[in-house]
Design a protein with these regions (language model features):
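Short helix/loop capping segments that flank catalytic or ligand/cofactor-binding pockets
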Residues: 30-31, 59-61, 103, 197-200
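Compact, glycine/acidic-enriched structural inserts
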Residues: 53-79, 83
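Short, polar loop motifs at secondary-structure junctions
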Residues: 52-58, 100, 104-105
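Acidic/histidine-enriched ion/cofactor-binding microenvironments in catalytic or ligand-binding pockets
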Residues: 43-44, 87, 183, 195-206
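Terminal domain-start leader segments
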Residues: 1-49, 58, 78-82, 86-89, ...
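Short beta-strand segments
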Residues: 22-23, 51, 96, 190
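Flexible, acidic/His-enriched mid-domain "rim/lid" segments that flank
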Residues: 3, 76-183, 194
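Short, basic/aromatic beta-hairpin or loop at an interaction surface
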Residues: 19, 182-195
Length: 206
């Protein structure tokens, strides 16, 4: 996964920045391997840090990719980020414009004392993820095969009188039996006239 850090550092060079702050859960997982809900990842030209609170310290150390150091913050995550930015000379910082809220942006401005410039690099991050590496392609194919096999397995269950939510539960159970970690979104099963409707949750219709 070093290639992903390399791609982040290419963004640093292209944008003329000293550091990047990854804050959204999808990008945190993609670039660090961490699956927890609360963290901030700071990437500089030579270092990478994942800042978490005490609840996620052990988990993070077991999940992060090589080249990323886990830092456990004590009070406020921005205090640790400020220390790191000062220590590693981060005066300009790229942030995720789609994830950082208005209040979050002002909090960064107030707490990161040595950071004089912040720039939205969301588009650059998203473009990096468009190009799938070999491992991603394998995982995508594995997910496709698993979903196909799970659907094939429940075909005998599809009979008149079965409720939509029962089919959804059966499909999710089948996928998890085969190794799925979960579903991407709530499973949608629609039968009869309801199959012409736009995305909706599965109901008790038969």
């Amino acid at each position: 996964m070093q290639d992903r850090l390399t791609r982040l550092r290419n963004i640093l060079e292209k944008e003329g920045l000293d550091g990047l702050l990854i804050s959204s859960r999808p990008n945190t997982f993609y670039y660090t391997g961490f699956t927890g809900t609360t963290s901030k990842c700071l990437v500089t030209k030579e270092n990478a840090f994942l800042v978490v609170d005490f609840r996620y310290s052990v988990q993070a150390k077991g999940q992060v990719y090589t080249g990323i150091e886990v830092i456990e913050h004590e009070k406020d995550v921005n205090d640790s980020l400020n220390t790191l930015c000062t220590r590693y000379g981060v005066g300009s910082l790229g942030i995720e414009g789609e994830d950082v809220t208005f209040s979050g942006y002002h909090s960064l401005c107030e707490n990161l004392k040595d950071v004089k410039t912040m720039k939205d690099i969301q588009d650059s991050l998203n473009r990096v993820r468009i190009i799938k590496d070999s491992e991603e392609l394998l995982l995508i194919q594995k997910a496709v095969d698993l979903a196909d096999n799970a659907f094939t397995e429940i075909l005998p269950f599809l009979k008149p009188g079965v409720r939509e939510y029962e089919v959804a539960l059966e499909l999710e159970y089948s996928m998890k039996k085969m190794g799925a970690s979960g579903v991407s979104f709530e499973t949608i099963i629609a039968s009869g006239p309801r199959s012409a409707l736009s995305s909706r949750v599965s109901m008790s219709s038969r």
